[in-house]
């Protein structure tokens, strides 16, 4: 166990809550102490859902540990069923409650409730949130997706159909992605049978085998369930996530091949503005910009591909907190001659960003904080995210409109960086500097200029002025390199010559 102020993933029961909150007619009874009810805030405050997640807590206290906590759980489960009347009841323990080993599954089955009871058993001190979401969805699919009364081959099919799998509550732009993918499939001539878990009920899960194939949009949640559907119901899988123009074309071709359709009408160059925008004049200065990428495996791998192939960036670092997909991450990093950073410690990520000094950071909410501290432009590409990344507007990441959103989200921080650099350049002008009075008020009173004096090395005024002319998003790197150069050579004062000598030294 590790004490930290930030975690990329919560415990497994938070993943189970994400699945339960995404679905209809499902309720989750969680054996947990009072302190574990914090997870409600993730859905009501951050995702801004209009209702609480469908979760009932036993909320036992320390004094209850001397009594019968098993009876408390059974009473809570019975009351939850009578109040909410779900069609499926999930039962499990939080990480803390696992220690008292009350067996919620056995206790709930002993109640004889007239609905399926699905026990969720996690190794809470070894596994995390995405594992919990994946296992919960897998157990639900296994419980309800039984054999069809009529085989698919004998049913009349006016058009092929598919299931969209993996979208959950608290997912990064999942709601908007589903809308875009559904519209694209409709244009291609493919119907959507069921979208799950998001918006699905237990009755909908029973209809999953009716589709001709499954599309795994978010492997962290849906891959295990989709593999089971493939083995049990002979449903092929589409594993390409349509993030970026190239991946969307590959996705269309893969779906069309399974559905027996012609993909060419949807492969035209005018479907997305990203390709032209990335070649346009105001974007040419972006070519070769060094970018550091960190997030869940699905979005991190896709971001690296889009950054390198479609925007002309150089991938300087690539990593993920998704240990279950470490093999895929390492294979993706090898394409850019990198070693993948697989960690859930934000301090390691911060140290890597500081070491690499990229010009753009693509990551989670924590990378946004890190980049802000280091003065580096940043865009969020992956959960976990804060409230601003659950926008009221339509803002997908997938398909052609998602590619447009990606271009705006990633490139605009760099463009604003250039604009701010120009403003900073003119602050040193005798007419436009910060201390200058408005021109109609006459001559401004001269004020003393503060000189930045580090603890060890001093900069003369000329070197400070020259440093300010460097774009702010690489200014920190220039300062550090110059000070390191001066320290190594025992120079007590940094001048303009020192600044340029250091630049030449580190450019070799």
Swiss-Prot record:
Pathway(s) per entry: Porphyrin-containing compound metabolism; bacteriochlorophyll biosynthesis (light-independent)
Cofactor note: Binds 1 [4Fe-4S] cluster per heterodimer. The cluster is bound at the heterodimer interface by residues from both subunits.
GO annotation (BP), single: light-independent bacteriochlorophyll biosynthetic process
EC number of this enzyme: 1.3.7.7
Entry-linked Gene3D superfamilies: 1.20.89.20, Nitrogenase molybdenum iron protein domain, Proto-chlorophyllide reductase 57 kD subunit B
SUPFAM superfamilies: Helical backbone' metal receptor (SSF53807)
Cofactor(s) required for function per UniProt: [4Fe-4S] cluster
Alphabetized UniProt keyword annotations: 4Fe-4S, ATP-binding, Bacteriochlorophyll biosynthesis, Chlorophyll biosynthesis, Iron, Iron-sulfur, Metal-binding, Nucleotide-binding, Oxidoreductase, Photosynthesis
Amino acids binding substrate: 417-418
Pfam families: Oxidored_nitro, PCP_red
Positions annotated to bind [4Fe-4S] cluster: 36
Active-site residues, record numbering mapped to chain: 282
Gene Ontology molecular function, alphabetical: 4 iron, 4 sulfur cluster binding; ATP binding; metal ion binding; oxidoreductase activity, acting on iron-sulfur proteins as donors; oxidoreductase activity, acting on the CH-CH group of donors, iron-sulfur protein as acceptor
HAMAP family: ChlB_BchB (MF_00353)
PANTHER family found in the cross-reference section: LIGHT-INDEPENDENT PROTOCHLOROPHYLLIDE REDUCTASE SUBUNIT B
Primary role: Component of the dark-operative protochlorophyllide reductase (DPOR) that uses Mg-ATP and reduced ferredoxin to reduce ring D of protochlorophyllide (Pchlide) to form chlorophyllide a (Chlide). This reaction is light-independent. The NB-protein (BchN-BchB) is the catalytic component of the complex.
Protein name from the UniProt record: Light-independent protochlorophyllide reductase subunit B
């Amino acid at each position: 166990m590790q004490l930290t102020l930030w975690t990329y993933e919560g415990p497994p029961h938070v993943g189970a809550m994400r699945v339960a909150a995404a679905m209809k007619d499902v309720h989750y009874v969680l054996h947990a102490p009072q302190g574990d009810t914090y997870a409600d805030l993730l859905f009501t405050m951050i995702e801004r859902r209009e209702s609480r997640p469908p979760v009932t807590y036993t909320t036992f206290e320390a004094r209850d540990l001397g009594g019968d906590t098993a009876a408390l759980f059974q009473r809570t489960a019975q009351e939850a069923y009578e109040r909410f009347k779900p069609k499926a009841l999930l039962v499990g323990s939080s990480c803390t409650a696992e220690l008292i080993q009350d067996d919620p599954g056995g206790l709930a089955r002993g109640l004889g409730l007239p609905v399926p009871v699905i026990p969720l058993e996690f190794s809470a001190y070894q596994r995390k949130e995405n594992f919990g979401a994946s296992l919960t969805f897998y157990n639900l699919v296994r419980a309800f997706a039984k054999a069809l009364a009529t085989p698919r081959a004998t049913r009349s099919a006016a058009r092929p159909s598919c299931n969209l799998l993996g979208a959950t509550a608290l997912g990064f732009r999942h709601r908007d992605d589903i809308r875009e993918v559904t519209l694209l499939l409709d244009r291609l001539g493919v119907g959507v049978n069921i979208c799950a878990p998001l918006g699905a009920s237990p009755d909908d899960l029973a209809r999953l085998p009716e589709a001709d194939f499954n599309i795994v949009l978010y492997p962290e949640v849906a891959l295990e369930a989709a593999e089971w559907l493939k083995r049990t119901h002979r449903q092929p899988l589409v594993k390409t996530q349509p993030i970026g123009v190239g991946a969307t074309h590959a996705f269309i071709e893969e779906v069309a091949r399974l559905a027996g359709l012609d993909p060419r009408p949807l492969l035209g160059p005018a479907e997305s503005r990203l390709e032209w925008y990335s070649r346009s004049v105001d974007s040419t200065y972006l070519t070769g910009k060094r970018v550091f990428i960190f997030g869940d495996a699905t979005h991190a791998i896709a971001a690296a591909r889009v950054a390198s192939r479609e925007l002309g960036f150089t991938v300087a670092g690539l990593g993920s907190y998704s240990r279950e997909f470490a093999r895929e991450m390492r294979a993706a990093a090898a394409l850019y001659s990198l070693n993948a950073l697989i960690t859930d410690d934000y301090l390691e990520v911060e140290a890597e960003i500081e070491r690499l000094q990229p010009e753009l950071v693509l990551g989670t909410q924590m990378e946004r904080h890190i980049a802000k501290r280091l003065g580096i432009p940043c865009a969020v590409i992956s959960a976990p995210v804060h409230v601003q990344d659950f926008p009221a507007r339509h803002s997908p990441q997938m398909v052609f409109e998602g590619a447009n959103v990606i271009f705006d989200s990633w490139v605009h921080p760099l463009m604003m960086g250039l604009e701010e650099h120009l403003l900073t350049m003119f602050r040193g002008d005798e007419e436009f500097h910060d201390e200058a009075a408005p021109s109609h008020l006459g001559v401004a009173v001269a004020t003393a200029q503060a000189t930045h004096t580090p603890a060890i090395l001093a900069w003369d005024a000329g070197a400070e002025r020259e440093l300010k002319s460097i774009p702010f998003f690489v200014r920190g790197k220039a300062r550090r390199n110059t000070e390191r150069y001066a320290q190594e050579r025992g120079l007590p004062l940094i001048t303009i010559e020192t600044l340029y000598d250091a630049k030449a030294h580190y450019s070799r």
